[in-house]
């Protein structure tokens, strides 16, 4: 995987979660978000994911074994717009 630029982090997170189908009741551990990204980007990815939670794009579900997250289905259209803009920009580059 090529290095992610800072502006690529948010769409990359949303795209990863959407591709895996982590919407509503299907969730994954917060710790799984940076997997597959370059090691030096993992801290930035976690910070961006926390901001996505605050912004309401990602829902959180606290459990006894850690924080679980999923995409907010109510913001599906916005999420796909962000992903599509990012993919079309990457295709042009």
What is the meaning of each model-derived region?
Residues 1-23:
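Short alpha-helical segments that sit at the start of domains
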Residues 20, 55, 86-89:
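Surface-exposed polar/charged interaction patches
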Residues 30-43:
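Short helix-coil junctions and helix-kink-helix linkers
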Residues 37, 71-73:
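Short beta-strand-to-loop capping motifs
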Residues 46-50:
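Short, hydrophobic-biased segments on the C-terminal half of alpha helices
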Residues 53-63:
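A short, conserved structural fragment
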Residues 65-71:
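Minor-groove-contacting beta-hairpin "wing" of winged helix-turn-helix DNA-binding domains
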Residues 74-93:
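Short, amphipathic alpha-helical interaction segments positioned at domain boundaries
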């Amino acid at each position: 995987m090529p290095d992610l630029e800072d502006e690529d982090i948010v769409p990359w997170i949303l795209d990863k979660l959407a591709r895996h189908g982590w919407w509503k009741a299907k969730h994954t551990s917060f710790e799984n978000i940076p997997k597959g990204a370059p090691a030096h980007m993992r801290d930035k990815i976690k910070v961006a994911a926390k901001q996505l939670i605050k912004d309401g794009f990602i829902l959180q579900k606290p459990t006894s074994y850690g924080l679980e997250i999923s995409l907010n289905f109510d913001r599906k259209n916005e999420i796909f717009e962000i992903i599509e803009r990012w993919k079309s920009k990457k295709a042009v580059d």
